[in-house]
Swiss-Prot record:
Family statement drawn from the similarity comment of this UniProt entry: Belongs to the Ycf4 family.
Keyword Flavoprotein in record: no
GO terms of biological process kind: photosynthesis
Stretches that traverse the bilayer: 22-42, 57-77
Protein source organism: Ceratophyllum demersum
Topological type in the membrane: Multi-pass membrane protein
Keywords: Chloroplast, Membrane, Photosynthesis, Plastid, Thylakoid, Transmembrane, Transmembrane helix
HAMAP family the UniProt entry points to: Ycf4
Gene: ycf4
Primary location recorded for the protein, binned into one broad class: plastid
Gene Ontology CC: one annotated term: photosystem I
InterPro entries, per database record: PSI_Ycf4_assembly
Function statement: Seems to be required for the assembly of the photosystem I complex.
Name listed for the protein in its UniProt record: Photosystem I assembly protein Ycf4
Localization per Swiss-Prot or TrEMBL: Plastid, Chloroplast thylakoid membrane
Length: 184
């Protein structure tokens, strides 16, 4: 969702609460739970999963390895669920012509730096930089170059923009900010 007027441009950034993250967190949780149940049933010698008899899988070495994969998968799954619940990476970019200030806000991981808030004067913006990495899967990226601060990415690496869409976005933003576009 984006909102734009003559003086203010607000771009809402989607964080980790994406459909693909929910899908992979569920698949990883269920798969690792299955591995852990198979490893546990081979250790106990009982059928915790009725798909096949537990005597077919010896605990050493297959049961140990499956238990290890199950535990590792549960840790990775819990990490994914935590990033989804904390909505890491979400936030907004706000360009305010009236105040002459650019605000960039992102949610991070819990702790001292949970809120990432950057503020710049519009007059310090040197250019909007667009980089296109050629290859089998070309990925355009958009950056804002700030005097004395370097470049700040404005697009995520997992966003699937075509070069044409990225050019359009870069042109609109550069026009709004009244700065040049650099293409690399």
């Amino acid at each position: 969702m984006n909102w734009r007027s003559e003086r203010i441009w607000i771009e809402v950034i989607t964080g980790s609460r994406k459909t693909s993250n929910f899908f992979w967190a569920c698949i990883l949780f269920l798969g690792s739970l299955g591995f852990l149940l198979v490893g546990t049933s081979s250790y106990l010698g009982r059928n915790l999963i009725s798909l096949f008899p537990s005597q077919q899988i010896p605990f050493f070495p297959q049961g140990i390895v499956m238990s290890f994969y199950g535990i590792a998968g549960l840790f990775i799954s819990s990490y994914l669920w935590c990033t989804i619940s904390w909505n890491v990476g979400s936030g907004y970019d706000r360009f305010d012509r009236k105040e002459g200030i650019v605000y960039i806000f992102r949610w991070g991981f819990p702790g001292k730096n949970r809120r990432i808030f950057l503020r710049f004067l519009m007059k310090d913006i040197q250019s909007i930089r667009m980089e296109v990495k050629e290859g089998v899967y070309p990925r355009p990226a958009l950056y804002m170059e700030i005097r004395g601060q370097g470049t700040i990415p404005l697009t995520r690496t997992d966003e699937n923009f075509t070069s044409r869409e990225m050019e359009q976005k870069a042109a609109e933003l550069a026009y709004f900010l009244n700065v040049p576009i650099e293409v690399f």
